Amino acid sequence: MPQTQELDQRIAELEMKIAFQENTLEELNQALIDQQFVLDKMQLQLRYMASKLKDLQSSNIATQAEETPPPHY
């Protein structure tokens, strides 16, 4: 009889560990999903900023080296 109780206790402990691991896995999965969402958003922002920078570089705005120096008073 004590052996059966021992086995039941071990099974209960293993079930608790599995439940904890399943919960941890679900939390990690959700964190990964959230991070992927943030990463996707950041990639879109980076593409937008790169496009804007390219537009600015190709515009008719002179660079600082091309600007004529201001008159000295």
UniProtKB/Swiss-Prot annotation:
Pfam families referenced in this protein's UniProt entry, alphabetically: SlyX
HAMAP family: SlyX (MF_00715)
Family stated for the protein in its record: Belongs to the SlyX family.
PANTHER family with a match to the protein in the record: PROTEIN SLYX
Annotated NCBIfam families: PRK02119.1
Protein name: Protein SlyX homolog
Species this protein is from: Histophilus somni (strain 129Pt) (Haemophilus somnus)
